[in-house]
Amino acid sequence: MTPEEEAAILDAALTRDTLAHAMQVARFLESPAPAAAWRWIDTFLEAFAGECPTVREALPIVADLRAEAVIVPAIDLEKLRNRQVVFFLDAVSQYVDDQRELRGLPVSRDVLEIAKEFGLKSDEAHWCVRVALTGKSTGCPFELLFPLLGHDRIMMRIGAISSHLLHGRGLEPIPYGPGGVPFKTIEGTKPT
């Protein structure tokens, strides 16, 4: 493929067909694309078409979603270093494992119900799950993110975070954060 041909693919407007073709060229997708891949592409477009006008902007997001691991900023990882958070993330992983299909589930609502069992506030619960799954604090709704990641990636990413938190220093948080400010992890309260 010439550089001009590659540029034409990357600079194409983001559509179902242009994304599928670019994913095949980047070896993220086999050819011909199976029906499940077209559903994945449709979900991706629903989640990200507004922020990705071209294939060039979409492919790094596709790569992040297809990766088996995620890089979590150190300070965010420290915020997760708490027993309730580790158990909460494990419960979310079990919830995912129990689902036959991740499409069409009220994931945001279900995550909040799980969070209540561990005394976590709703905004903190969503933040914990999003950071564990993407390494970022914002993104598309869980109802779209979960099907894009799929069962295996969700469980691998949560498992990796839990393993990292439980080994090494364990659940002992750092005493001070940036600028010497006393550091606090996300903590649950006693469920009512």
Locations of regions flagged by a protein language model:
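Long, charge-rich low-complexity segments
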Residues: L166-T192
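Small-residue-rich helix-loop
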Residues: T2-F118, G177, K184, G188
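Charged substrate- and nucleic-acid-binding regions of tRNA-handling and nucleotidyl-transfer enzymes
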Residues: G104-P173
